[in-house]
C-alpha cells in the first residue's frame, strides 16, 4: 500500500466554522477543532497539549509552518522598514518603546491586508456554498468567471474537511471529484495585492499544500491549481496550475515536513 492510497476520513457534514484557524487542529476523522472549552468553562484556542490529550492531528498549513518562507520574511522586513520610515521617535520615548511601536505598526499593515483577504475569501466561499453574501461581489464574480474559463462548468465542492491516516488533516477551498480527464481538480484560493497578473508567482508552499490536499481528499491524481484573487483590483484573478511532476515533488517535500513536525512535537 502506497502512502497516497492509505485510508482517509471525511467529515460527513463539514461544520460551517468561520473561526480563526490559527491553531489548525482536527479530529482523526476530519472535524475541525480550532477551539476547545477549557477547565474554567471558557472557550479558547486549541493547543498542542490539547491535541496530544485528545489525539487531534495538525492541518496541512500547520505542518507547512515549520518550513522557512523567504518571500514572507522579506515582506515582513519591508513592512518594518516602511513603518520606521513613517514614524518618528516621540519625546521621552525609550529606544525599546520606539522599536516596539514600529513593530506593532508594521504588524497592523499585515492585519489590515489579512482582514480584507479574509472578507473576500469568505464571500467567495459563501457563493460556492450557496450562502447569500452581499460584500465583494466583483471579486466573487471575477473568481467564478476565471474558474469557468479555465475548467468549464464544474460541480465544485466547497470547504470539505478531511483527516488522513498519515496524521494530517485540512479543509480544502474547492475540489471536484471528476472533470474532463476524469481525475478531479483541487483549487486553493489566495488573495493578494496585485494589478498585473505577470507579478503573481507560485511558491513551493502552495505546491505542497495542494499536493497534500489531493491525497487527503482521496483524489491523488487530481489536477491542482491556485487561483490568486486581487485585493487591489476587484475582479482580477490569475490561475496557476501545477504540473504532475511538481505535485509529486511537492508531496515528497510535504511528507518530509510532516515527519519533522511529528518528531519535533512528539505527536503523531
Language-model regions, residue ranges each:
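Mg2+/Mn2+-dependent nuclease catalytic core
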Residues: 156-265
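Metal-dependent nuclease catalytic cores that hydrolyze phosphodiester bonds in DNA/RNA
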Residues: 1-169
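Acidic, carboxylate-rich catalytic segments that either coordinate divalent cations
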Residues: 268
